Amino acid sequence: MTTHTKNHPCRAKARPYIHPAIRYNKRRMAESFRSRMMRWAFNFFPAFRGTGGRVTYIAEDWSEVRIRLPLNWRTRNYVGTIYGGSMYGAVDPFYMVMLIRRLGPEYIVWDKSATVRFQKPGRGTLTARFTVGDEELRAIAQALETGARSVDRTYQVELKDETGVVCATVEKVVYIRRKEAPEKSLRDE
């Protein structure tokens, strides 16, 4: 008796693979050599590697970053789902780093706070997509030009499973301000 692998009972739970560019229904900007090197650096950096997360894509202009967080022996908790600390740790650094890269060296950017809402246990590989558009950069510059010393911006990212169901939502508050010009000393005059 021959069984086909398509009808095999172990294959019944397999979900079809959907390419990330199709899943998010957006055209993907090509990675540059520099952004690819940063992706590799993130993936090999011990603090990020310890979360179990993997950066899968960084746009050349840092307007988009994508990550995945698989369920494996490093991310599995006592009840067999993805550990909540791994979920948060995998998404923690990206909005701050993206804003630092997009705004440039004349700005100071810090994470100020974070809130995590767990909606469903992560029972498989989770993905997250971070975006910081040009309109967001204009809004930040405009807020700082109106006389405000600093501005707090709130960003939200969702960790989704393979079927697109949201397992956790992370809300990050990021502090941004312009660097002040160094004061001239009397010797400089």
Place the predicted regions along the sequence by residue.
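Alpha-helical membrane-targeting segments
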Residues: 19-50, 74, 78
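Hydrophobic beta-strand-centered segment that forms part of the acyl-chain substrate-binding groove
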Residues: 98-135
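Catalytic strand-loop segment that frames the active site of acyl-thioester-processing enzymes
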Residues: 50-81
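HotDog/MaoC-like acyl-thioester-processing domains
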Residues: 21-28, 32, 122-123, 133-189
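Hot-dog-fold acyl-thioester-processing enzymes
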Residues: 75-94
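Short, low-complexity intrinsically disordered segments enriched in A/P/G/S/L with frequent Arg
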Residues: 1-3, 12-15
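Short hydrophobic alpha-helical segments enriched in small aliphatic residues
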Residues: 5, 9, 18-20
